[in-house]
Design a protein with these regions (language model features):
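Specific transmembrane alpha-helical segments of multi-pass solute transporters/efflux pumps
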Residues: 13-18, 26, 47-96, 105, ...
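Cytoplasmic-side transmembrane-helix entry/capping segments in multi-pass membrane proteins
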Residues: 4-8, 60-70, 116-128, 150
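Alpha-helical transmembrane segments of compact multi-pass small-molecule transporters, enriched
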Residues: 41-45, 95-110
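Glycine-/small-residue-enriched transmembrane alpha-helix faces in small-molecule transporters
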Residues: 1-37, 142-167
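Hydrophobic/aromatic residues within transmembrane alpha-helices
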Residues: 24, 34, 38, 83, ...
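Residues that define the loop-to-transmembrane-helix transition and helix capping
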Residues: 29-32, 90-91, 117
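Hydrophobic transmembrane alpha-helices of multi-pass small-molecule transport proteins
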Residues: 46, 116-138, 157-160
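Hydrophobic residues within membrane-embedded alpha-helical segments of Major Facilitator Superfamily
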Residues: 6-13, 18-20, 41, 71-75, ...
Length: 167
């Protein structure tokens, strides 16, 4: 039962992020302010450690850590926040974490020659069908701004997939 409670809490956290961010972007915050709020606090907490220990961090740790930070950190966050200026939170929820497994399968094949399982191929095909349906709906509404936001969500999802593959 504890696993179900933990899963429910995780879903609530993931589901609240695009809604809260959309409210911030459409309210009084600029995307730059939201990115600063999201990552600035953690950066300030980490800064003293970094200043004291940066020479002890190996070159390989830097080469591995910096891309991870950009993939799952500021790069992905900035794309999501900027995309929420143009597209609804529901699109981010569908095109962000909803499409990430398809990107992991595709990029894993392209970059590492990992052949995806039949289930992964079926799942990626269903994800692509959903993306096309969402894009055609936005395109029929002749709303280029929504399509731009959707493209940012897909780019953020690619960064999330690269993060998973980097691990």
């Amino acid at each position: 039962m504890n696993g179900y409670i933990a899963a429910a809490i995780a879903v609530l956290i993931w589901a609240s992020y695009p809604v809260a961010t959309r409210a911030g972007v459409t309210g009084s915050f600029t995307p730059q302010e939201l990115v600063t709020l999201r990552f600035g606090g953690g950066a300030l907490l980490f800064l003293p450690y970094l200043l004291l220990q940066w020479r002890q961090v190996s070159r390989s740790a830097w080469l591995q850590g910096v891309p991870l930070t950009l993939f799952q950190g500021a790069g992905m966050g900035a794309l999501v926040i900027c995309g929420l200026q143009f597209a609804p939170a529901a699109h981010q929820a569908a095109l962000g974490p909803g499409v990430s497994p398809a990107w992991v399968a595709l990029l894993g094949f392209v970059i590492f020659a990992r052949r995806p399982s039949t289930r992964a191929i079926v799942g990626a095909t269903l994800c692509a069908t959903g993306v096309l349906a969402l894009a055609s709906w936005s395109g029929m509404a002749h709303d280029a701004r929504v399509l731009a936001g959707d493209a940012m969500f897909l780019a953020a999802s690619v960064l999330g997939a690269l993060y998973v593959l980097q691990l």
